Amino acid sequence: MRLFLFILTLVFAGNAMGQEKPNMLIIWGDDIGFWNLSTNNMGMMGYETPNIDRIANEGAKFTDYYGQQSCTAGRSAFILGQSPIRTGLTKVGSPGADLGIRPEDVTLASLLKDEGYVTAQFGKNHLGDKDEFLPTNHGFDEFFGNLYHLNAEEEPEDPDYPSDNELLVKLFSPRGVIHSLADGDIVDTGPLTRERMKTVDREFKLAALDFMTRAVDQGKPFFLWYNTTRMHFFTHTADDERGLSGQGFYNDAMVGHDMMVGELLDHLDALGVADNTIVMYSTDNGPHYNTWPDAAITPFRSEKNTNWEGGFRVPAMVRWPGKIKEGQIINEIMSHEDWVPTLLAAAGRPNVKEELKAGVTVDGKPYKNHLDGFDFLPLLTGKTDVGPRKSFFYWSDDGVLTAIRTGDWKVVFAEQRAKGFAVWREQFDELRIPKLFHLRRDPFERADENADNYEDWWVRKVPPRIAVARMELQKFLMTLAQFPPRQRPATFGVDQMMEPLYNQQKSKNQ
């Protein structure tokens, strides 16, 4: 048996030598807290995540890395390289919603296909409910995964679900776990029930292992985005995971999640391609900790769907043996949007941002997009110690600009004062004069609530910081005028339902 595995490794290694472009394995959790990884919490949570930690230990991890405030926004920022306000993908997608990636926006997958990559996405998508929004219509050769957050998936199992309303069931019930191919083949493999949730990530993992094997066997570089459903609520822990952490059902599932990451890393080793594979680990947004104990945790202020660091700042790490120095800790500002230009540069296309701005054909289709991301390859590979990103914009899911970070300073224009689940229900409070935080001296944004002399400090510091933030915003708005929002942010309520009638009457009066 050992001889067989040795020969198999040699065969795969030989095939891998036929391609020079790096493979790309992107591993994401869902709502993973910054503090839920032992590389960050240093054992304080009472369990370990050795496989995720391995990526950090063998590469670089970030301290000032930004996702977005919720699922759809974070995922769109990564795969499109654009600010969610530009694509209109700020709101969490729901069953039946006309919300998803528009055909005018190019994806990272399409760009990499142009570079000879085979592409696949396995696991949670959350970038559109309809067939037109499926990943296989946006650059992916294969998709196998679910389309929404877990609590939406299990709604039909609720005894009060209006299953007798045929129209509602037809239009707004969650679709099952979809397997689709770029040739148009779409198969619904069945609903994501509470029972299936216990092990569905293992289904996605097996598909990922098979895809990598096939890609290496073909001698082609691969781009694989593996999106687990863990650790979104409601957590349904597998029977064989119970007790793994000694810290309750949620952390048991977290350990199980880490074990699946380990299987992916081990498979790269077995295929002989680990040294030529970029592995990145992260999550979409900050934790949803108002559902504790079925929730993640972070040292940063508040949680997802707020303006605070806890809603946006997420764990992130990347490994590329021989290219990224082991054991690095990077304090530069980076965000999900930055991976499109960074990974394209790694694939040999360093000017993709300029190409797309001018207009270019990708995978046989014309695109003209503004990428909001920056190429971090020089920083990651040690050619510079200064990152290209100098600012970050905190957009709410309603499309409100709540804050701007420039350098170490954060100016807050609107704050979420609600606690617990009310952060989803209550409006942001717009401030007549903004709050100010220094995210090096006060990374957890405690000063306005805990410091006796905050207002005195504020008066001395805020005027130039507001000016700098306004200048940064003006630069962004100039690009937004040239490349305007693709669609209006969606709503959870009914406020937009009357707009077509108002607009119709307005047109008649003109």
Where are these regions (language model features)?
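N-terminal signal peptide c-region/cleavage motif recognized by signal peptidases
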Residues: 13-15
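Formylglycine-dependent sulfatase
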Residues: 2, 17-430, 434, 443-445, ...
